[in-house]
Amino acid sequence: FILIAVSGDGSAYEVTQKQPMKLAAMEGLYEGKEGAGLVAVGLLNPKKEAYNDDVNPYLFKIEIPKLLSLMGYRNINAFVPGIKDVIDGGYTLPDGSTALSFQEKRKRGLLAHKALADFQQAKSEGRDTDAANFETIIKDNYSYFGYGFLEKEEDLIPNVPLTFYMFHFMVMVGGYFILFFAVVWYFHSRKKLENFTA
C-alpha cells in the first residue's frame, strides 16, 4: 500500500512538470496561485461555461492547504498555474523561463508544420542547403508541433468535470485500498502475534 501512495505522488509530480493543463483540470484550478491547496472534496459549479468567465468554478470545496504546490513542485509556496494561466502564459516556469501563451505556441507549431512541408519539398528537389535550414526550424519548434493542430484556446482544455471527478474518484479508491490493506495487515499481524504467544 505504500507503493500506491509513492506511485500517486510521483505521477502528480510528473503531470505538474509535463502537463500543467491536465493538472489544472484535475483540480478544477482556473486561476493559478502560490501555495495551492489540494481539493479533498469539492462540487464543481455547472454554470462555469468558459475558462475566462467570472463564475466561481466551485459550489463548495474543502482543500488541504498547500498540498498541491508541495506535490507538484516539492515546495509548499510554489506557484501552480491554472487553466487561464496555461492559456495566457506569462508565469515563471521551474527552469526560470517564462511560459508561452497558447497563441504563441500555436504560432510556433504552425511554423514547424510549414517548415516540414518546405523541408520535404526541398529534399525532393535536391536543395540540401534549404532542407537543412528547414530542418533547423523544425527542431527549434518541434515541442510546439501539436499546438499547430489546435484552432482555439478551448481546444487545449480537457473536459474539466470529467477529469476532476474521475481523478478524485481514483484518489478516493487509492485511499480506500491503503486503508483496507493497512487494516488487514494489522489484524493479520495481531493474529500471528496471538498465535506466537499462545
Regions found by a protein language model. Give the residues of each.
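Aromatic-rich transmembrane-lumenal/periplasmic boundary elements in polytopic membrane proteins
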Residues: 2-107
